[in-house]
Design a protein with these regions (language model features):
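Conserved active-site-adjacent core of cysteine acyl-enzyme catalytic domains
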Residues: 43-94, 100-109, 116
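Low-complexity, compositionally biased segments
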Residues: 14, 21, 109-115
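Alpha-helix boundary/interfacial micro-motifs
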Residues: 35, 39, 110-111, 118-119
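Low-complexity, intrinsically disordered short peptide segments enriched in small/polar/basic residues
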Residues: 2-5, 101, 112
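Charged phosphate-binding loop/patch that engages nucleotide di/tri-phosphates or the phosphate backbone
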Residues: 116-124
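Active-site nucleophile-adjacent alpha helix/oxyanion-hole segment immediately C-terminal to the catalytic cysteine
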Residues: 1-65
Length: 124
């Protein structure tokens, strides 16, 4: 089973509903505040809600260079077994998490949750 690390990362170290910003910040190596600004800019540019999948997917793919990876029918743990190395953003229904070298970083243990989207991030 993949490793799990409880990960809270934002400017004031408060646990909040910020999974998109937190996960993208960790996976990209960008500061939390910079990702928050990029999400707002992307939302204005594309006229979409910044937490809508199609909106933040554009940021992940077009700006940050993430590329889609097949994850059909997999849990995070299944995915980690197939992709033990590298940095990935993994989307579940209503949530997104980061997998780095066989370790899931998130505010809760989601290793058994089913993935709907996965992106491999370039090396930081």
């Amino acid at each position: 089973m993949a490793n799990y690390v409880r990960y809270i990362h934002n400017d004031d170290k408060v646990t909040r509903n910020d999974c998109v910003t937190r996960a993208i910040s960790l996976a990209s190596g960008l500061p939390y505040s910079a990702v928050r600004k990029k999400l707002r800019y992307t939302a204005r540019l594309l006229d979409c809600e910044k937490l809508c999948v199609s909106c933040y997917e554009w940021l992940i793919r077009e700006v940050l260079g993430g590329r889609p990876v097949n994850c059909e029918g997999m849990t995070i743990n299944d995915f980690a077994e197939l992709h033990p190395y590298g940095t990935y953003l993994l989307r579940m229904d209503g949530h997104i998490s980061t997998l780095i070298d066989f370790t899931v970083y998130d505010i809760f243990d989601c290793r058994n949750h089913r993935i709907t989207n996965a992106w491999k991030m370039p090396n930081n």
